[in-house]
UniProtKB/Swiss-Prot annotation:
B6-vitamer kinase involved in the salvage pathway of pyridoxal 5'-phosphate (PLP). Catalyzes the phosphorylation of pyridoxine (PN), pyridoxal (PL), and pyridoxamine (PM), forming their respective 5'-phosphorylated esters, i.e. PNP, PLP and PMP. Its cofactor is Zn(2+); Mg(2+). Substrate binds at S23, H59, D233. It comes from the Bacteria. Pathway: Cofactor metabolism; pyridoxal 5'-phosphate salvage; pyridoxal 5'-phosphate from pyridoxal: step 1/1; Cofactor metabolism; pyridoxal 5'-phosphate salvage; pyridoxine 5'-phosphate from pyridoxine: step 1/1; Cofactor metabolism; pyridoxal 5'-phosphate salvage; pyridoxamine 5'-phosphate from pyridoxamine: step 1/1. One of its GO terms (molecular function) is hydroxymethylpyrimidine kinase activity. Belongs to the pyridoxine kinase family. PdxK subfamily. The gene is pdxK. Can use both zinc and magnesium that is complexed with ATP. However, magnesium seems to be the preferred metal used under physiological conditions. Disruption phenotype: Cells lacking this gene lack pyridoxine kinase activity but still contain pyridoxal kinase activity. Cells lacking this gene and cells lacking both pdxY and pdxK are not auxotrophs, meaning that the de novo pathway of PLP biosynthesis is functional. For PLP salvage, the pdxY single mutant can use both pyridoxine and pyridoxal, the pdxK single mutant can use pyridoxal but not pyridoxine, and the double mutant can no longer use both compounds. It is an enzyme of class 2 (transferase). This is Pyridoxine/pyridoxal/pyridoxamine kinase. It comes from Escherichia coli (strain K12). Mg(2+) binds at Y136, E162.
Length: 283
């Protein structure tokens, strides 16, 4: 069999459960650099589509790289269909986006993809900023999220600051955060998981709030003092994995939070500045 024939036999195409669209670093454990191994640990196949390719996070004293050009980004997405690699696709997740134009390109691709995958789960982590840093993405990204990705998503995972930006509402207490999250729900957007919600500082707790049209569940976890980056990306990877493995939403959120805490403690024990996934035997 010739190599040309071999690589054009689409029945042999590698398939994935998840397409993960977000940042990638050469050194470190953020974006797809932590999400992909975490998803694979859960026994799921994943294709990683980079939005930015960086040497490392900008917290180090040297930093190189930038956003993937639109032509490349759209080509990465198109190639997955050209390779016929999406027959078994179950979910698409998004994290850090490099430009507003990438968000528009992704939304157009998702809209077309849904025609062949009407049950596709689209989970958006609207990475915009946080309370400590403010907005740390380009200023036109929040509106691009509102206009293009939120109307397509079944679930989103904003932190408190991002929830405020997306809704224009003050969310510094639990009731206001819940109200803001409910204001985003629609026929398409079924749930909002608010990370880093107000917790009990005295008891060293943080809260994650799971909001649907019918219920609100508040999950408390121990607060770990750390500057580790990528914990949100890991949380989303664990969450989507749990959902695809059949866990109910609140249970999947709870388990994802516990796994993040486990990874953070393991990383601290190994005195690393970058997240380290424990082997499955220790998970």
């Amino acid at each position: 069999m010739s190599s040309l024939l071999l690589f054009n036999d689409k029945s042999r195409a590698l398939q994935a459960d998840i397409v993960a669209v977000q940042s990638q670093v050469v050194y470190g454990s953020v974006g797809n650099s932590i999400a992909v191994p975490a998803i694979k640990q859960n026994g799921l196949n994943v294709f990683a589509v980079p939005t930015v390719l960086l040497s490392n996070t900008p917290h180090y004293d040297t930093f190189y790289g930038g956003a993937i050009p639109d032509e490349w980004f759209s080509g990465y997405l198109r190639a997955l269909q050209e390779r016929d690699a999406l027959r078994q696709l179950r979910a698409v997740t998004t994290g850090y986006m490099g430009t507003a134009s990438q968000i528009k390109i992704l939304a157009e691709w998702l809209t077309a993809l849904r025609k062949d995958h009407p049950d596709l789960l689209i989970m958006v982590d609207p990475v915009i900023g946080d309370i400590d840093s403010g907005i740390y993405v380009k200023p036109d990204l929040p509106e691009a999220y509102r206009q293009y990705l939120l109307p397509l998503a079944q679930g989103i995972t904003p932190n408190i600051f991002e929830l405020e930006i997306l809704t224009g509402k003050n969310c510094r207490d639990l009731d206001s955060a819940i109200a803001a999250a409910k204001s985003l729900l629609s026929d398409t957007l079924k749930w909002v998981v608010v990370t880093s919600a107000s917790g009990n500082e005295e008891n060293q707790e943080m809260q994650v709030v799971v909001v649907t049209a019918d219920s609100v569940n508040v999950i408390s976890h121990s607060r770990v003092k750390t500057d580790l980056k990528g914990t949100g990306d890991l949380f989303c990877a664990q969450l989507i994995s749990g959902l695809l493995k059949g866990k109910a939403l609140t249970d999947a959120v709870h388990r994802a939070g516990l796994r993040v805490l486990e990874v953070m403690r393991y990383t601290q024990q190994h005195e690393s500045d970058e997240l380290i996934l424990p082997p499955l035997a220790e998970a």
